[in-house]
């Protein structure tokens, strides 16, 4: 599943062709993705202008010039394909096959500039909806979300309060979207390794100074990943078709049995399964 840096990269790729553009044609080729499309989906969007394309957690938000916001979630395998009028393809993809299969093309947007943006989703775990902009923050998808990890609201004081008295490990809590929005398995593993904090240590026993280091590590990892265009594992390319390359900077993720890259550490990266997810860490320097 794409994490915050990948979704932000997709947003950056789609923004130039969607922001300030009027949608002259919208086609819903099936009535549902993970959830049914809302009534009037095509009619409301046709003729609307996407004023701004934003991201909240792992959601893309198309702010319309009407009362609604177009909410899009990529799920496990959703991706966008951008086709310019001259036929040039600039795909922004989360994909499981090298070439799009037309049967997986579920939603098509066409702008007044003649650009066609097609949403493909083989697994159909992604979804789209229209939510009233005035009450967006109260919607169940957003009401319980914590602060954005790159915002000023996500700081050591916030995380210390979230960790206080908790017996769970910090990884479990950082993946809780109510504590911080948008973090996923890859970047939590990476940040904990940089901060040299064990993913299994009871969070309530982590000191304030170490939490300050962890917050800084989270922000650094995310900024670097966004600058690198995300991580290309098996299913991701940027909105211009180029591959993200942050995976080449991984210190822990998917590096089981390899040397830890932290300075002065001679440990070997291990892997444990927590709640069905692989946790990569160094048992030597992460305490």
UniProtKB/Swiss-Prot annotation:
Functional summary from the UniProt entry: Involved in base excision repair of DNA damaged by oxidation or by mutagenic agents. Acts as a DNA glycosylase that recognizes and removes damaged bases. Has a preference for oxidized purines, such as 7,8-dihydro-8-oxoguanine (8-oxoG). Has AP (apurinic/apyrimidinic) lyase activity and introduces nicks in the DNA strand. Cleaves the DNA backbone by beta-delta elimination to generate a single-strand break at the site of the removed base with both 3'- and 5'-phosphates.
GO terms for MF: 8-oxo-7,8-dihydroguanine DNA N-glycosylase activity; class I DNA-(apurinic or apyrimidinic site) endonuclease activity; damaged DNA binding; zinc ion binding
EC number(s) from the headed UniProt entry: 3.2.2.23, 4.2.99.18
Note accompanying the cofactor annotation: Binds 1 zinc ion per subunit.
Name under which the protein is recorded: Formamidopyrimidine-DNA glycosylase
Catalytic center residues: 2-3, 58, 277
Gene name of this polypeptide: mutM
SMART domains with a match to the protein in the record: Fapy_DNA_glyco (SM00898), H2TH (SM01232)
Signal peptide positions (record): none
Similarity-based family: Belongs to the FPG family.
Positions annotated to bind DNA: 104, 123, 166
Family annotation (InterPro entries): DNA_glyclase/AP_lyase_DNA-bd (IPR015886), Formamido-pyr_DNA_Glyclase (IPR020629), FPG_cat (IPR012319), MutM-like_N-ter (IPR035937), Ribosomal_uS13-like_H2TH (IPR010979), Znf_DNA_glyclase/AP_lyase (IPR000214), Znf_FPG/IleRS (IPR010663)
Record Gene3D superfamilies: 1.10.8.50, MutM-like, N-terminal (3.20.190.10)
Membrane-spanning ranges: none
Family matches, as PROSITE patterns: FPG_CAT, ZF_FPG_2
Cofactor(s) required for function per UniProt: Zn(2+)
Reactions it catalyzes: Hydrolysis of DNA containing ring-opened 7-methylguanine residues, releasing 2,6-diamino-4-hydroxy-5-(N-methyl)formamidopyrimidine; 2'-deoxyribonucleotide-(2'-deoxyribose 5'-phosphate)-2'-deoxyribonucleotide-DNA = a 3'-end 2'-deoxyribonucleotide-(2,3-dehydro-2,3-deoxyribose 5'-phosphate)-DNA + a 5'-end 5'-phospho-2'-deoxyribonucleoside-DNA + H(+)
Organism the protein comes from: Phenylobacterium zucineum (strain HLK1)
